[in-house]
Amino acid sequence: MLEKIIKQKKEEVKTLVLPVEQPFEKRSFKEALASPNRFIGLIAEVKKASPSKGLIKEDFVPVQIAKDYEAAKADAISVLTDTPFFQGENSYLSDVKRAVSIPVLRKDFIDSLQVEESRRIGADAILLIGEVLDPLHLHELYLEAGEKGMDVLVEVHDASTLEQILKVFTPDILGVNNRNLKTFETSVKQTEQIASLVPKESLLVSESGIGSLEHLTFVNEHGARAVLIGESLMRQTSQRKAIHALFRE
């Protein structure tokens, strides 16, 4: 599935026209996660669908969802902008950015031109996936994003990918995706297995498969300072109540 998505992205980039410059306030994604509202930082995701699960939320109003997340003290918001596989739109991110006061992460499959596009649509941070980009190219995009005033969440799915990246540079923010790319199954033990390789200066984020206070505590005990949660929140009627229930508040 990942290969299929990447192939589609390469086609999209060929015809990409950069949007007009718009004034957006800059917010620090890293600082928000480093000083969270709870014992662990929360990146709450605005996601309508996924390639593995199909449509997740029919009654999908991105701005209202984002406002609910902020009201429930999420530290940052992730917005899916990929259209073919996640039913996202760039406008969702821009609208969310204007509606909330916390940092916004663009979740997509980024190539060079999309780094500038991300800045123009209001992203405070972008996601770069280690399994998609070779380490040198990833580093180039990482530096480019930094020059444009954005933070970068560098995501890996396995230890070997992380080891290759660390030979080139040490990312400020490292995400371990708990989803096995071959089976698409999730396990928070993936964070445990990779955490020992994460440099102390990198802020560790655990992503995918987190749906309980026990999961939050487990990944936090193994070094995660933040989590990214999407589907388990999006499936609930009220995203605000879902966050409070997750933390048993």
Curated annotation (Swiss-Prot):
Record PROSITE patterns: IGPS (PS00614)
Pfam families: IGPS (PF00218)
Biochemical pathway: Amino-acid biosynthesis; L-tryptophan biosynthesis; L-tryptophan from chorismate: step 4/5
Enzyme Commission designation: 4.1.1.48
One Gene Ontology MF term: phosphoribosylanthranilate isomerase activity
Keywords: Amino-acid biosynthesis, Aromatic amino acid biosynthesis, Decarboxylase, Lyase, Tryptophan biosynthesis
InterPro entries assigned: Aldolase_TIM (IPR013785), Indole-3-glycerol_P_synth (IPR045186), Indole-3-glycerol_P_synth_dom (IPR013798), Indole-3-GlycerolPSynthase_CS (IPR001468), RibuloseP-bd_barrel (IPR011060)
Biological process terms in GO annotation: L-tryptophan biosynthetic process
SUPFAM superfamilies hit by this protein: Ribulose-phoshate binding barrel (SSF51366)
Reaction catalyzed: 1-(2-carboxyphenylamino)-1-deoxy-D-ribulose 5-phosphate + H(+) = (1S,2R)-1-C-(indol-3-yl)glycerol 3-phosphate + CO2 + H2O
Entry's family note: Belongs to the TrpC family.
Name of the featured protein: Indole-3-glycerol phosphate synthase
Gene: trpC
